[in-house]
Swiss-Prot record:
Residues 1-66 are annotated as: Disordered. Its EC number is 2.1.1.166. This is Ribosomal RNA large subunit methyltransferase E. HAMAP family: RNA_methyltr_E (MF_01547).
Length: 279
């Protein structure tokens, strides 16, 4: 599951909630809704509670003008400030609104679209695997590109997407690569991952955790891809990814970094793109 789809546990939006299961959530610091775990946290864990609250609305032209300029969220009793910030950011995020209008389950869909626009990766007839696929934005992008087979894997149960196979499974299980290839009828052309662990707020710790997760995804890709295939994974900037990059350079012809416009400007996330799997 992408950190785009994580949110503080007590966050419930005022008015209509995003159609994409609260996408692109602000991952809370330890003690503010995120599990405080040593080592690598469960990459698919999330609280899926949803709800609506409506508060009093001010009348008059000034209030309407203010609403047009910026959507604000009233801090409710019992709601942490991190949740209020998350809700306010959601209401004012153009990619959240665009995802709602265009039918994507997550604003994260635009990251894959922009990665594909930059590197021209997705082609009709491909077999694509999406690791940590909930709620399904990247699966939707792969299907719209004309992929013949799309398999999404997540620890979370996902609502069905026509044309895709969705597995409620840990991709690090020993049998996961063979199971995926059996579902697709052969090796994959692409393995993509927008996975992120719960963040702690400590930059170095978060960087090390996401690099470890990307390394697991890279090993899965090497076991699953056909020669010539590509791999995409999210990492946080931090300078401790040399082992990951060396592994990718040993197994792929080209390795590049790219930060899509859909990634938040304040976010440390970037994507590593490995092309031309050597087999």
């Amino acid at each position: 599951m992408s950190d785009d789809d994580q949110k503080p546990e007590d966050a419930t939006p005022d008015g209509s909630e995003p159609a994409e299961n609260q996408p692109d959530g602000e991952t809370p610091a330890a003690g503010e809704g995120a599990p405080d775990q040593a080592g690598l946290p469960g990459w698919g864990s999330s609280d899926k509670r949803r709800g609506r609250r409506s508060g009093p609305m001010k009348k008059g032209g000034d209030a309407r003008a203010a609403k047009q300029m910026f959507e604000r969220v009233k801090t409710a009793r019992g709601r942490k400030s991190s949740s209020t910030r998350w809700l306010q950011r959601q209401l004012n995020d153009p990619y959240v609104k665009k995802a709602q209008m265009e039918g994507y389950r997550s604003r994260a869909a635009y990251k894959l679209l922009q990665l594909d626009e930059r590197f021209k990766l997705l082609k009709p007839g491909m077999r694509v695997v999406d690791l940590g696929s909930a709620p399904g934005g990247w699966v939707q992008v792969a299907l719209k590109s004309g992929a013949s087979e799309v398999v999404g894997i997540d620890l979370l149960e996902m609502e069905a997407i026509a044309g895709a196979t969705l597995l409620e499974k840990d991709f690090t299980d020993a049998d996961a690569p063979s199971l995926v290839k059996a579902e697709m009828g052969g090796a994959a052309d692409a393995v993509v991952s927008d996975l992120a662990p719960w963040t702690t707020g400590h930059k170095t710790t978060d960087h090390l955790r996401i690099v470890a997760l990307a390394e697991l995804a890279a090993h899965f890709a090497v076991e699953t891809l056909k020669p010539g295939g590509f791999f995409i994974a999210k990492v946080f900037q931090g300078g401790s990814d040399s082992d990951l990059l060396n592994f990718l350079k040993a197994n792929f012809e080209k390795v590049r970094h790219f930060k899509p416009d859909a990634s938040r400007s304040e976010s440390a996330e970037t994507f590593v793109v490995a092309m031309g799997f050597k087999g």
